[in-house]
Every structure is written in C-alpha cells, then in structure tokens.
Amino acid sequence: RFRHAAALLGALTAITLSHAADTETSPAKNAASADYIAGQQAVEAKQWKAAVDAFTRATLQDPKNADAWNMLGYSSRWAGDYKAAFAAYERALALDPHHRGAHSYRGVAYVRTNDLAKARAELATLDGLCGRDCEEYKLLAKAIAEHKPQ
C-alpha cells in the first residue's frame, strides 16, 4: 500500500508540475510567486501542512490563480482535510472549468471518500476534455480501478 501511495504521489507531482501550462493561469505568474514555489517544494517533500500553508498564501495573493487553488486542494487532501480539499477544487474549477488537474484530483478525492459515482463523473469530464490518453484521465481511471471500499 505504501509503494502504491508513493507511486501515485510521484505521478501526481509530475502531472501537477507539467499541468500549469495547460491552464489559463500563466506559468510565469506562478513562477513569480515565492509562496507557490514553496508549496511545490513542500509537496515534493510530502510536507502537507507546509504545502497547505504556502498554497493558502498563494491564493490570498492571487485569488484568480486556478493552479494555486488546485494545489491547495491537492495538499489539503493529502493532509486529510477533504472538506478543505473539495472547497479548493471547487474554486479552481470555478476559475477554470477545463482545469484537468482539478478534475482529476477532485475525482481521486471522491474515490478516497468512497463516492465512486462522482469520481466516474469526473472521469467522464476528463474524457471529454482530453481523451483517455491524457495523464489526468489515466491517473483517475487507475485510482477508480484500484479502489477498495473502506
């Protein structure tokens, strides 16, 4: 189970770091934010509270940054705060309804909270946005396939 979590974290981190260019939020804007960078570093180090704190500051500095909201959701989920995670994903998707990372991560959060119907709805959304070959779709499809009810 630990190896699976570590592999999933690695895949999520790779998607996260590569996804910024696919959204309406400018990667240059993210690069200029020391808090966003600190959040990314905390994610890479699996320091979830530090990541939540950094991405919270990043969203306060730039409330229209869908990537920062997405990463706040991601970090909150890993910290075990699903309520905060879902709220952050909602904000990211309100800003950018086509944000593949937010759809994928929210879908994984639905899997982790045993709401497979909503997870599958996110998967269908991703299929429409990027097809079945995009990393975000594959990640969520794998999480659904490997789900074991808790």
Model-derived regions: residue spans:
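Alpha-helical segment of the N-proximal tetratricopeptide repeat
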Residues: 30-61
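Helix-start (N-cap) detector for alpha-helical repeat units in TPR-like alpha-solenoids
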Residues: 32, 66-67, 100-101, 133-134
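Structural marker of alpha-solenoid helical repeat scaffolds
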Residues: 61, 95, 128-132
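Canonical tetratricopeptide repeat
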Residues: 71, 105, 139-143
